Amino acid sequence: MGAAFLSSWPWDNLGAYKYVLYAPLVGKAVAGRAWERASPDHWLLLLLVLFGVRALTYQLWSSFSNMLFATRRRRIVRDGVDFGQIDREWDWDNFLILQVHMAAAAFYAFPSLRHLPLWDARGLAVAALLHVAATEPLFYAAHRAFHRGHLFSCYHLQHHSAKVPQPFTAGFATPLEQLVLGALMAVPLAAACAAGHGSVALAFAYVLGFDNLRAMGHCNVEVFPGGLFQSLPVLKYLIYTPTYHTIHHTKEDANFCLFMPLFDLIGGTLDAQSWEMQKKTSAGVDEVPEFVFLAHVVDVMQSLHVPFVLRTFASTPFSVQPFLLPMWPFAFLVMLMMWAWSKTFVISCYRLRGRLHQMWAVPRYGFHYFLPFAKDGINNQIELAILRADKMGAKVVSLAALNKNEALNGGGTLFVNKHPGLRVRVVHGNTLTAAVILNEIPQGTTEVFMTGATSKLGRAIALYLCRKKVRVMMMTLSTERFQKIQREATPEHQQYLVQVTKYRSAQHCKTWIVGKWLSPREQRWAPPGTHFHQFVVPPIIGFRRDCTYGKLAAMRLPKDVQGLGACEYSLERGVVHACHAGGVVHFLEGYTHHEVGAIDVDRIDVVWEAALRHGLRPV
């Protein structure tokens, strides 16, 4: 049986090419020099600007909704927005394409609309009257109809498939529903124009006001103070709240109104708990995370790869895209402001086995970690974040990449020694990182070459491999540091650790483990067919086409993870860096020790097996 009439968009298969549907209007505006006030096509420019601002309105509300650092206490549905919902709502703006053509058709059908005055205050009164007398009751009736039988299962069910209401959910509906909504929106404007009081300002004010209220109702954050409705009880029936509309999404048999609960009162569909729940939500309750991954920003471009900037972009692995370039100056200014004033903040969350996991960001960028004068400030930020997590009652804090740099804080040792009474466990996650790298090395490998060999990870990998009788060429100029590591191996295994000081020593070795940056010249020493395993931050650039390059050590989260909707840097969906996964394992296993400082080589296999047992999988 085919799909119901007007239940899917005609341009569903076009992807981003759907925006070509704007081309006739844009082309007409350009050809008619619509930017000139005297142009007969000036109305086209105003129309396109209006719809551009409409799209921006929903985007700004989406950004607000996903600013967990500012809104998490007043979130109504506490779950995160997962990849499934993001994908379903990817084309949320389809209704704008439909409605811009509906509006253009109206302008062509009624040429007098092209010459509206800029402002007429009387039109506002007419539009307000018709909104209350026509749009609100008609929407209420239509909405209730869409909740019955065939109309719900074939049309409105799509809108209600969103587990967590979001501003983009407001636009996520079928063509039939958007045609009805577009017609209802037009009633007040048409009435004002018919009465001779239409204006450009009225069109902008009414349409943008309509969009703001729709986005607000779906934002999943309570924006009204509870005391407002106690002080002015009549407002309860004149304006809905995000909590009020979220109840409709959860119960589906109550709170059908467009913006005015008065019509639910008249229709007998007003949920009695709406205002009590609104009061409770507006008071704000902070949910305590049990696991915190303390990340940092990589660079200015990557700072845009977060849900509160562009949700859909954050749901895909990071890569520099052309549309980001105009945003770079703004992102650079934000970087300066964060450097000056910001503290660690929440960027995203998910749930695993019913427990809340949060990602916090230290407001520092990759280059900051290489500035000597910035060291104390970074450590202070990390320390405050750990103390905050400890005070909240979190169980584990895992340090990302540069936040656990040996030269910065000894892999977290600084904080554990300074605060011996910490209840939260501090974890660098390097034990699992080492395990991931080691398990990537093919069985039967007899020789490897390693840079960064005397680092924390390099030491652990070298000692583990020599126990397996794998010859490890450790690239280091420091004989003292090499010998210190070699002495940690048992006498019968020390022979497998070999110090080398030149890259040419590895010209016949096809397994390179990279813990220190490699230039193109240095990479040329690798023979064809070499695979570069990496634990260097940032990862090296793959210059050799006849070689393969691994990504940073990572693992896939268990299948039962919920509410995960953002990719971790350039990793695939559901995949996190090994240091993140190491913290998760530490939490799930209930380990009571801090994992800081040197890696315990004896625990590498223990942690690896625990990760697999809990459902984490190698990539």
Curated annotation (Swiss-Prot):
Main location, first listed in the record: endoplasmic reticulum
Compartment(s) where it occurs, according to its Swiss-Prot or TrEMBL record: Endoplasmic reticulum membrane
Membrane topology, as annotated: Multi-pass membrane protein
Reactions listed under catalytic activity: a long-chain fatty aldehyde + 2 NADPH + O2 + H(+) = a long-chain alkane + formate + 2 NADP(+) + H2O
Keywords: Endoplasmic reticulum, Lyase, Membrane, NADP, Transmembrane, Transmembrane helix
Transmembrane region(s): 44-64, 93-113, 123-143, 190-210, 322-342
Signal peptide: none
UniProt GO cellular component terms: endoplasmic reticulum membrane
Stated name of the protein: Very-long-chain aldehyde decarbonylase GL1-1
Organism listed in the record: Oryza sativa subsp. japonica (Rice)
Classification of source organism: Eukaryota, Viridiplantae, Streptophyta, Embryophyta, Tracheophyta
